[in-house]
Amino acid sequence: MKNIATFMLVSALTLGFFTSCDSGVQHRTFRGIYADDPAGMEGLYNPERGFRLEVALDVTEKNYVWAPEEYPDITSYLEEQSEFYASDSVSLVQTYFYLTGAVGKELTGEDFRTMGIFFDKLRSLGKKAVLRFAYETQFLGRAATGPTLEDIIRHTEQLKPFLEENKDVIQVVQAGMIGAWGEWHSSFHGLEKSDDTKRTILQHICRMTPEGRAVQIRVPEYKNLLDTASNDYKRISFHDDFIVIKKHQWDGGMSEGTPAYEQIVRESPCFPVDGELPWETWSMNEDPDNPEAGWIIDGLQTARRLFLQHFTSLSVIHNYKEKNTKDKYSMMYWKETPVSTEFLRENKMPVSDGYFIRKDGSVAERNVFDYIRDHLGYRI
């Protein structure tokens, strides 16, 4: 009781001091950004969240995996993409380190120097890595080589101190290593066919990952291989590499209403969650491997899904403005799709008090691309 009385007296004196001393007291009223405020229609450069790039580095060959002749060094593709997407306020880079040349071997000092140069460039650009290690660049049995379980264990043990030294530039580590693009399918040695092998690899990836950094997994099924009471389970989040909204054979069984979808909804609020749309060729029905027709991906429903599953980052290079485009892709349509306060309130999605108006009170139109850009990992 004495403590309560003392607190009330101090509070009263403090209030009296501020109300009696007119000089030096400033009152500020804060509000949301109006559409016609300076930079009111531009994206915020939010650290560790928002849109991300994707860069794949062949660690042994020291070049960009998908166009080594055009980008024969370690960082030129990263620099080009950073400039190309600068207007989209990108602070993250999904960083693929392909260890193909280290299959059957130990990682060398030169391998670590190569990865270190890439990390240093990220630092200088003010960006962080959504980090994934992989070995295989082909699927459907086309890979020419791939790691064994022993290769992966050896490399994770070598990588552990290196990642600890560079944790300042790592936002999250994705559980790659297995199969095509590190997506846990189509591996050369069939590693994904054994639950014991997948569990062992996931545990070693968790040990490799610096303390304070989450691990993201492709589908909840793989996370569920672990004991739910284990520390490893408690630090694992998700990355969805095939966001198409409607059900598709390649969606990993994660379309809305499935147990996997609902697990992500439940477990994602306190974790970074990453994702991407398929490439534009899928939407344009130009992917010869696609087992069924593609489509333009709905922007409003994508925003709703990102909200429900608490996404932190989304690839801005998929289905948007890829080089040498001859078509208009999904995200370009998003820029033409208005988003309304009614839609947001109906779906219990956040909206700032000034987002849809100008300073004079008139209504400002916003599109779903801008809404996702401005809220991803921050308010959704």
Regions found by a protein language model. Give the residues of each.
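Substrate-binding cleft of secreted/luminal carbohydrate-active enzymes
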Residues: V219-N224, N231-F369
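An active-site-proximal structural segment forming one wall of the substrate-binding cleft
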Residues: E110-K128, T145-V172, D196-M208
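Hydrophobic faces of well-ordered beta-strands that scaffold small-molecule active sites
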Residues: R49-V55, V93-T95, A129-F133, Q171, ...
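Aromatic-lined carbohydrate-recognition surfaces of secreted/lumenal glycan-active proteins
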Residues: I170-W181, L202, T209-D227
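Boundary/entry segment of secreted carbohydrate-active catalytic domains
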Residues: V25-S91, Y96
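Active-site groove signature of glycoside hydrolases
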Residues: V130-L140, L159-E192
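Aromatic-lined substrate-binding rim segments of carbohydrate-active enzymes
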Residues: Y77-E136, R213
